[in-house]
Amino acid sequence: MQKNLQACFFAFGGIFEVSLACLTPTVNRLRRLSLLAHPRIQEKSLQKKLQACFFAFAFSYICNMNEFKSEIEVTADGSATLYRADIDEHYHSVKGALTESAHVYVNSALRYRASDGVSSNGLTLLEIGFGTGLNAAMSVEAVDVPVRYVSLELYPLSPQVVEQMGYDSILPYIGAVNAAQWNTPVAITPLFTLEKRIANFLSCDLPQGVDVVYFDAFAPEKQPEMWSRECFQRVYQAMNPGGVLTTYCAKGVVRRLLQDVGFTVQRIEGPVGGKREILRAIK
């Protein structure tokens, strides 16, 4: 998938360079005709607009490519999830998408950390895998303190796909979090700021001073590169002392890796009807 993504951008980049080459003679002719006499109207602005168009097209193509391989399925608690046929994996637990999100992340991480006292600056939360935006939507009003919510996602879904999942009837903020612009902070409420980043977790810069981590990547057998010692080390270094990380995956190898980088790891009860245990790691 990642190779396909890179190939797409290389292709778009090639088209973009050709388009700029075609555009330059036109800009020069217009300048000679004095149509570009105003100092603010330069070829750079036209190039930027053209570049923006190509990036928008690339982003749309990537979203559609991702969605083509996704099917909506209803989980045991009545809420929907997406199934990725290309990797044979669901975005949420088939035992209950809403149940998993509420228990594993909102209650066991965000509310747990908030109950331990929060400074006037509030909490910074890092999510690994924005997905459908379910975790973000359920976190908006989960605590009565300021929350800066930074979510990393390499393959974004379009809001139209999430609309088909029926979350809007039970989650008032699902539309807002999915419609929020990428790569810029957006105030969903006065206390909740969302920053969705199109980024590769393996190589991007992580926010610092993180208090809560939702580690919600696809399963280790599907994305082993996301569950390495190096990845957990990067997260650990980005967190404040007392920071809390939770994940649905309670495999022994994951627990040992978390411990190895410095976390104190707890095996706690899993969601009703779902996994027997989940992991909570504290720095």
Language-model features: where?
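The AdoMet/dcAdoMet-binding core of the Class I SAM-like
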Residues: A114, V118-G209, Y214, E225-F232, ...
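Rossmann-like AdoMet
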Residues: M65-L123, V140-Y167
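Class I S-adenosyl-L-methionine
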Residues: K251-K283
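A short glycine-rich, Lys/Arg-flanked "PGG" loop and its adjoining helix->strand segment in the class I
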Residues: R229-P241
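N-terminal, intrinsically disordered charge-dense segments
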Residues: L20, P25-P39
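Conserved beta-strand signature within the Rossmann-like core of class I S-adenosyl-L-methionine
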Residues: G242-C249
